[in-house]
Amino acid sequence: EAKGPVSTVYFGGGTPSLFDLSQLELLVSRCLAAGTHPSEITLEANPEDITDERLKAWLAMGITRLSIGVQTFDDDRLRWMNRAHSGQQAIDAILSAHALGFQHLSADLIYGLPDRKTPFAEDLEKACDLPVDHLSAYILTVEDQTVLGRNVQKGLESVATESLVEAEYAL
């Protein structure tokens, strides 16, 4: 039971959009039944998980904001990150969500990507041209225990230079 008013609920941590719709609806309804009446309920989603059916269901259950893991609109860098979506799919997901009634959309971007064909500034411009009201930018973090981390250690992959990361952060 909630000890005080909860103004926002955030379903994050990766890909909660992969929840079966009935599971997610149960989570949302339990939040609401606990006496909370949040002004905002956010769901993180990857572009490839966004369909009209899911968008309509999320709206019906009370999701008010989508935080979409765009990462970049650069297809080459998306492939490098082993992402399942393309830059165009990210754009289409945002436009579909807006067209179906989501008033609050967030796009997550990553800066500090090595060997970009398009500058991070172009990702920012594209995101700002879309109907999003929030942008989050995260630096690429290379963890030793990941495939990328091991490949960097072996010299098979490069990382962005410190000056590039600083310049992109300054944007």
Predicted features by range, described:
Residues 1-171:
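C-terminal scaffold of the Radical SAM
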